[in-house]
Amino acid sequence: MEHLSYHKHLSIENTEKLRIVLQEFPPFVRDYFRGLEPSTTAKTRLSYAYDLKVFFYFLQQKNAYFSHKEIKDIVVGDLELLEAVDIEEYLEFLKVYQDSNGKTRTNDERGIHRKLSSLRSFYLYYSKRKLIKNNPTIVVDMPKLHKKQIIRLDPDEVAELLDLVEFGGKDLTGMKKVYYEKNKLRNLAIFTLLLGTGIRVSECVGLDMEHVDFKNNRIKVIRKGGKEDYVYFGDEVEKALRDYIELSRKHIQACEGHESALFLSIQRKRMSVKAIENMVSDSAKQVTMFKHITPHKLRSTYGTNLYKETGDIYLVAEVLGHNDVNTTRKHYAALDEDRKRRAAKVVRMREE
């Protein structure tokens, strides 16, 4: 199915997973997911389904009325029986619980926030269609989200990381040396691309050979929600991509169905998000022990550097593919404060 394009294949895969999960729900739940389809991606709907699966599990485990019911026997009218206190109990349950396999699960404030958002959307669907009158989710306050400090690499750490990827195999021996040399150009291209454009790891994984346009020094990416966008790159990214494509990628015969993929695994298949996440984490640990670096942190590093150079929050939002500039502003608010502090020292009222 690779010929359909990576993103279409992923959408089909998520749709099939969603259908399997929906088989565990009461029939009326399928109406909700049908209603979501025009405005959401398959990945989003699958996430909602997993969230609701936890909610129904909670009802069976902790609610006296639902504990004697099979999940498939629940009807839409049963949703009205719950009150705000039940929803609050659910949020408390989410902090730490044992799943159906006995595994301990936890949620931080962001996980709880998302699951309440999913539940509100679920209730709102039936409320708008007048299938229920009582909606207890709207009177429960959303958990407060504390601002997270932006973790990013300093300029010297960026240089050290790229040097490690490009020259770090000198002291390796045996199979480690062979593996390093075989993948060095690919890995350097990935790190340089992430640090030099700020694209998401999912966008990186989804790149095909034909998406690289050296004539205009840009790549075509598929953003969240399936929107196509062009991202421009500079000389360093161009060199890393050219070296990888000309000296490595063109000489690899990809497995059937993966011929179009830009970045291939050692098995000659399209690299996965997890593979790149592990590669970034393992390499970054050798450069900085006190920062947990992920591909998203490389994206934050690029966004920070771009904002420092331009001071243009709208440009940063556009380049990073944020639909709402307030999302960007929220992430880089600390840098705004730093600029304001420096601005306060620029204007002098008396000459010294």
Task: Give residue spans per PLM region.
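Conserved catalytic core of the tyrosine transesterase superfamily
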Residues: 1-352
